[in-house]
A protein has these predicted regions:
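C-terminal beta-signal and terminal closure region of outer-membrane beta-barrel proteins
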Residues: 1-29, 125-137, 150, 188-223
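Transmembrane beta-strands of outer-membrane beta-barrel pores
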Residues: 85-87, 96-100, 167, 183-190, ...
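Transmembrane beta-barrel domains of outer membrane proteins
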Residues: 80-84, 171-173, 206, 218-220
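Conserved small-residue
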Residues: 1-69
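Residues that define the transmembrane beta-barrel architecture of outer-membrane proteins
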Residues: 73-77, 157, 161-166, 209-213
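Extracytoplasmic gating/loop element in the C-terminal half of outer-membrane beta-barrel translocons
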Residues: 8-12, 97-178, 183
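Membrane-embedded beta-strand positions of outer-membrane beta-barrel proteins
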Residues: 92, 179-181, 217
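Repeated loop/turn-to-beta-strand initiation elements of outer-membrane beta-barrel proteins
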Residues: 87-90, 176-177
Length: 223
């Protein structure tokens, strides 16, 4: 699915370079007119040229571009066999998606707006005065929503491709009954580690996909 210039659901984003290491670096770089007061630990965006190739040294809505994979998968696939050997049967089904991005948004721990839960990756890796990591997984913490850091940008864009073992079933067949064990959502392989990639974009704090196990007996009655 496409439109002129880019794919449908490809995101128009600011290009994040990294985080500012301190306040003095903020002053040495193009002014970021995206709202709020920009400080050390905030996201540093790339200044893009205009149609004439000129730089205005101001970061605003003109410094966005369509980039990355769309948030709707370009490829959705699945596969799985059903096998039988003597009295045993076995089946499984893998489901996957490729060429898709996840946009992380709505995450604002300790703030007065948005979702205030603290995800583990934030607790483990955020910028602070004692951890001035310009590639930290989360910018500096703030009491109020920091507009500079919540703009849709490549800082929050992730590879959302995944391959999931959706169903697996093992059965034993007797003359009058069949006993089976079935599992759903058993394994997920993905470069995205923050939440179930099948949930898609957002904060990851909606109800997760459940892992389910069933044991059952099927009877057959011959007249």
């Amino acid at each position: 699915i496409s439109r002129v210039g880019h794919s449908v659901d490809q995101q128009l984003l600011y290009i994040a370079e990294r985080l500012f290491i301190d306040d003095s670096e903020v002053q040495r770089n193009p002014k970021q007119n995206l709202g709020g007061w920009v400080s050390g630990g905030d996201i540093k965006y790339k200044n893009l040229p205009d149609v004439n190739g000129n730089y205005d040294n101001v970061i605003d809505s003109n410094d966005r571009q369509y980039t990355g994979m769309p948030t709707t998968p370009e490829i959705v696939y699945g596969f799985g066999p059903s096998l039988r050997y003597k009295k045993f049967d076995f089946s499984f089904f893998f489901q996957g998606a490729a060429r898709v991005s996840i946009m992380m948004n709505g995450i604002h721990p300790f703030g007065a707006d948005g979702t205030r839960n603290v995800l583990q990756f934030i607790a483990d890796d955020y910028w602070s005065d004692t951890n001035q990591d310009i590639y930290a997984g989360y910018p500096r913490l703030s009491k109020r929503d920091n507009e500079n850091n919540t703009k849709a940008s490549t800082y929050w864009q992730r590879n959302g491709a995944f391959l999931k073992l959706k169903n697996l079933e093992v059965g034993f067949n007797h003359k009058f009954f069949r006993v089976y064990l079935r599992g759903s959502n058993l394994l997920t392989f993905s470069p995205f580690k923050y939440w179930d990639p099948e949930m898609g974009s957002g904060s990851g704090l909606s109800y997760p996909t459940q892992r389910v196990f069933n044991v059952g007996v099927q009877f057959s009655i011959n007249k």
